[in-house]
Amino acid sequence: VHGMIKHREKGVTPFQYAVYYLVGFIANFFDVLGIGSLAPTLATYKLTKTVDDDLIPGTLVIGCAIPVILEALLFLTKVEVEILTLVGMYGCGIIGALIGGKVATKLPVKALRITMGVGLLSAGALMMMSKFGLMPLGGNAIGLHGIKLVIACIGSFILAALLTVGIGNYAPTMVMVYMLGMNPAVAFPIMMGLGALGVCNGSFPYFASNRYHHHAAFAFTAAGVVGVLIAVYLVTSLPLSVLQWLVILVAFYTGITMLKQAFARENVAKANVG
């Protein structure tokens, strides 16, 4: 935070200030709900031209570090999770980011997005069927054991690896937790904790090289903290049934978004060739 203030840019307009703080609040509020903050923030910065393209990656990673850490800490204190499940999924997630990431970066991103998008839409449909009593999914467990714990750990490994190529882990983690019979609230400390670990590691190179917009990063952090506090209170106050519907909506939203991203890249490439 000291670095953001000390090296802040001069000549920032009131419009830019408004964008920085509004984006910080709104993006982090919805990040807590599992929708994610990086993609909408990147799009807003590009649309409003308030942050140079080469500074956007560093601004996003540095700006969201403190809010994501706060999310993780708040959910860890407010949501009960069995320690074996938490440590197992955290550990496999860290290993997945370090080892699995090397494999994931060699795979075609388009194919990964399509696979994940179709998977999320299919899972969303199954979860919706369970809400109407057509499928035996969901539950209220706060921990996993046996084969279910193994599946969860393998899933955390894979999702953390995919995170290194820009495929978010929030929605898939929520879906995995739901389908393994756990309380949907348990997904929040798990996915936020893994996100915090990844963001902390990723922010150091940008901070050291000073490749980020200081005003935008500070505003994203300051307003983001407020957004996180409000959203965490709302999420932890929601009844189980509402949380289950939230997971279903996030699954459909993220699945459609991933498919659009996959085919949008292809259409852009064809247009450039034409």
State where each predicted segment sits.
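Alpha-helical multi-pass membrane helix bundles of inner-membrane/thylakoid proteins
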Residues: 10-15, 133-156, 266-274
